[in-house]
Amino acid sequence: MPRVDEESFGQLLDAMKKAGGVLNDAGIRWALGGGLAAWARGGPETEHDVDLLVKPEDAERAQQALAEAGMRPEKPPEGWLLKAYADNDVLIDLIFDPQGGPVSDETLDRADELEVYAMRMRVVRLEDVLVQKVLALSEQEPDFSSVLELARSLREQVDWDDVRGRTCSSPFAKAYFTLVEALEIVPAATR
């Protein structure tokens, strides 16, 4: 994958810290998700956006808190997230109902507290990140490259049987596991 522009990545991290601080100040539970959650554990840098997981009942309040802090809110047509734009148009996704099921107290409790870019925060487990990404694969979005890169860079840290078990109903997940096993990135299923 091409190298991520350092300035853009720095802007993502700054936006993550600002948004996280705003949500903390508002008393909203959240966890870092997506590509930045993987990066926080040694995965590749991301160039897309900042994914913050919040419970469905907190999503609108979280977006309002970000708006009050100067971020530009947006309500997309998808019914599983809200958005806000930070400085330099960095996109903050407030995800409350990702593939794999809505964000719950259990999801947030499973997240580990880590120091990311000099800020303590909850970071979603890699298994949860991968479940969400693998279940998002579809006929319209069949790109395996990012989930292959995550598997390659973080394979030793992932409970692959957990990810398999939670994604087994998806034909795209079956294709993904066939591929990563054939490439010897991930061990074959232990069942």
Residue ranges and their predicted role:
Residues 1-191:
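Compositionally biased terminal segments of proteins
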